[in-house]
Each structure stands twice: as C-alpha cells, then as structure tokens.
Amino acid sequence: MSLASRRKVRIRLYGTNPADLDQVAREIVDLAKKMGVAVRGPIPLPTKRLMVTVRRAPSGQGYHTFDHWELRISKRLIDIEASERVLRRLMTIRVPDTVKIELQLI
C-alpha cells in the first residue's frame, strides 16, 4: 500500500462507565490487530471529576445541609495506522450509549 492510502488515526474514547470504555477499546484494538495494522494503546488519560454541591433545604431556614454530586469522565486514547478499509470496519463496532468516540486524522 502506498503512503497516501495509509493514515494515522487518533481515536479518543470518553464516557462515564469505565467498564464499557475498556470493552470498546478492547474491541477496537482486537479489530486492528486482526486486520494487521499498527496499534498504540489504549492509553488511559486522567479522569475528570465534575463536582456539584447543592443545598438540601429549599429555603434559607433551618440547618445548613448540603448534598455533593460527582460525575467522573474517564478517557482512553488509541492510535492506529489505518487504511480506508480498516476505518470502514471501525464504524461497524457496536458502542454503548455511555461511550462517545472522536476520530481524528493525523
């Protein structure tokens, strides 16, 4: 294959459920290895924690009690040297609703 038909693709996965994230990353890596292309990853990126503190009481009367809510966003990074055929196969992978995927051609 010529260099023009092979491109480097950076796949960024992120979501709130780390188990689903790891499953999708494993499927992508297995598919790439089966197709015979070079793979780097999955590289775990730092988990982002979104914290929200809210007051329990609806009015200003009474005790000062608060609830703390947290949302953790986990991220993974995979680099693949892929052709158009491999990219088309990547599009067929079933992805849960908790996982979002970004593809970037480098």
Curated annotation (Swiss-Prot):
Pfam families: Ribosomal_S10 (PF00338). The keyword Ribosomal protein applies. Keywords: Ribonucleoprotein, Ribosomal protein. InterPro entries: Ribosomal_uS10, Ribosomal_uS10_CS, Ribosomal_uS10_dom, Ribosomal_uS10_dom_sf, Ribosomal_uS10_euk/arc. It comes from Pyrobaculum calidifontis (strain DSM 21063 / JCM 11548 / VA1). SUPFAM superfamilies: Ribosomal protein S10. This is Small ribosomal subunit protein uS10. One of its GO terms (cellular component) is small ribosomal subunit. Belongs to the universal ribosomal protein uS10 family. Part of the 30S ribosomal subunit. Involved in the binding of tRNA to the ribosomes. The keyword Ligase does not apply. GO terms for molecular function: structural constituent of ribosome; tRNA binding. GO terms for biological process: translation.
